[in-house]
Amino acid sequence: RKDKELYFSLYEILGFYPHDISYYKMALMHKSIMHRNAKGKPVNNERLEFLGDAVLDAVVGDIVYQHFPGKREGFLTNTRSKLVQRDTLNKLAQEMGINQLVLSNGHSSSHNSYMGGNAFEALVGAIYLDRGYDACMQFMQKRILAKMINIDKVAYKEVNFKSKLIEWSQKN
């Protein structure tokens, strides 16, 4: 894949061009590729996913805290968890075209429904390393919450735990 094409695709998704594209390449590399660096260590998006998960929690927590000034901790925690839950991240990755950029060995992508959400988190980790916390904040506010997710709608949406439990029990 050419860097120029990737730069353009990332610009479409992120709203800015990367400074160091290597972070973003790694963020889009699923472990099924089995790529190794010169020292023989695996190169994939798992570490960036770990970092992105933590940064995403902080950024979304910050946004929720600012957006709902009079709300209690329980409401804020619940709202943040709804915004960063796996289903939400998978849906965002699909809608934004992140899934199409992930390098994997075809077999795993069809069986791993979390791959897109994991790549989304890894991209947040890449943004953080490449451009810092403020860039992650801008990305979430301008690209995600302003265009793709209504924070008030998510915050006040009731989660039907009974139907979730039934759904889970039927799958397992």
Language-model features: locations:
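Double-stranded RNA-binding/processing signature
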Residues: 1-172
